[in-house]
């Protein structure tokens, strides 16, 4: 499929070249192959790549969760070698790369890692900010505010790579111990990463079915699956969050974590390498072992009981995002500098 996309873009580029178009600079995400042959059309153009991730057979994420290990471990390195061929085909043509986090940049081979600048896409901290009087309408419960005990959990798709199974398995105890809590879960039913569920099923429903019998009807009524939300509504969700839970394999760091921190949320997160770039334990959030659902719930409940700690962690989290990830003050100027350096280098 990558070659098919590359060929289609090559033909479109040739048509543009024949009309006199000649770019000085090409910026591309190489992951789907569109940029494979562009410098064959425009040999003098500089090519900069968005380096999201280089897949390695034994690190960082593929063998992380034994419950969802590869069914064919002997051939997994072969599959990944083929998957990475696209990266290697780009390395020779590219002049430089940019990665949003050190963790992602460090997955790349050293020969190309030396050409990668770490610069995040950036968070608009003027939009993602604390808002004391915010209200969020949730079907079945009316308006929720910061006066309510709201626990939030966000995935693009509800799946094991982002710890959905760990969170769901911890729900029965959380609902039992926190009788006033509302749990707001954001995410779709598909798969973004990792193994697909059995035919005709979704990870969302599989883990609902696993825990549903442990949760009384009245408690289950306090769990709200919101699907995907428009961005403004999503920010309001983060702004009312009393504790935000973020779980992920050692993988691409979710923008939603940084947005939650920018909104001043108190975060409980998995203690994995990409998360540790932004969360220092008990400074900008609290870290727990990814697989330890009991510790996760203890950390959540402890923060729900400690308003002073929540305020301190949320204040520190927002300060870190503003200092290192602010779109307009930090990241966009660095991106412009990177483009200028690429163009003139």
Predicted regions and their residues:
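Acceptor-binding helix/loop patch of EC 2.4 sugar-transfer enzymes
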Residues: 1, 44-85, 126, 130-131, ...
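Donor nucleotide-sugar binding/catalytic pocket of nucleotide-sugar-dependent glycosyltransferases
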Residues: 56, 68-148
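A charged, aromatic-enriched C-terminal amphipathic alpha-helix characteristic of glycosyltransferases
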Residues: 3-4, 308-344
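Short hydrophobic beta-strand element within catalytic cores of glycosyltransferases
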Residues: 266-269, 279
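Nucleotide-activated donor-binding/catalytic signature segment of Leloir-type glycosyltransferases, i.e.
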Residues: 191, 195-228
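Conserved donor-binding/catalytic core segment of Leloir-type glycosyltransferases
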Residues: 137-162, 168-173, 183-184
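Conserved acidic donor-binding segment of nucleotide-sugar-dependent glycosyltransferases
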Residues: 281-282, 286-293, 302-308
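Aromatic "clamp/platform" in nucleotide-sugar-dependent glycosyltransferases that forms part
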Residues: 249
């Amino acid at each position: 499929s990558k070659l098919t996309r590359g060929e289609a873009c090559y033909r479109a580029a040739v048509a543009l070249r024949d009309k006199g178009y000649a770019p000085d600079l090409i910026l591309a995400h190489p992951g789907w192959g569109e940029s494979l042959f562009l410098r064959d059309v425009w040999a003098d153009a500089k090519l900069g790549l968005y380096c999201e991730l280089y897949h390695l057979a034994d690190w960082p994420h593929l063998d992380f969760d034994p419950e969802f290990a590869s069914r064919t471990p002997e051939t997994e390195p072969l599959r990944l070698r083929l998957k990475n061929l696209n990266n290697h085909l780009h390395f020779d043509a590219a002049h430089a790369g940019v990665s949003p986090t050190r963790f992602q940049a460090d997955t790349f081979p050293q020969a190309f890692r030396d050409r990668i600048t770490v610069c995040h896409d950036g968070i608009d901290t003027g939009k993602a900010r604390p808002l004391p009087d915010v209200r969020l309408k949730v079907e079945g419960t009316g308006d929720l505010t910061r006066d309510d005990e709201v626990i939030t959990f966000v995935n693009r798709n509800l799946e094991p790579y982002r710890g959905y199974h760990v969170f769901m398995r911890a729900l029965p105890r959380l609902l039992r111990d926190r009788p006033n809590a509302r749990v707001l879960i954001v995410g779709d039913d598909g798969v973004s990463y990792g193994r697909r569920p059995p035919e005709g099923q979704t990870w969302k429903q599989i883990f609902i079915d696993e825990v549903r019998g442990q949760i009384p009807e009245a408690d289950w009524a306090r769990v709200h699956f919101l699907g995907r939300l428009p961005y403004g509504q999503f920010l309001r969700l983060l702004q009312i969050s009393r504790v935000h839970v973020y779980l992920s394999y050692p993988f691409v760091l979710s923008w939603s974590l940084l947005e939650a921190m920018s909104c001043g949320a108190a975060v409980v997160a998995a203690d994995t390498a990409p998360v540790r770039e932004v969360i220092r334990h008990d400074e900008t959030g609290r870290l727990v072992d990814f697989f330890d659902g009991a510790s996760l719930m203890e950390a959540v409940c402890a923060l729900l009981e400690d308003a002073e700690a929540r305020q301190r962690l949320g204040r520190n989290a927002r300060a870190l995002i503003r200092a290192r990830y602010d779109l307009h003050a930090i990241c966009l100027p660095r991106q412009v500098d990177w483009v200028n350096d690429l163009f003139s280098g």
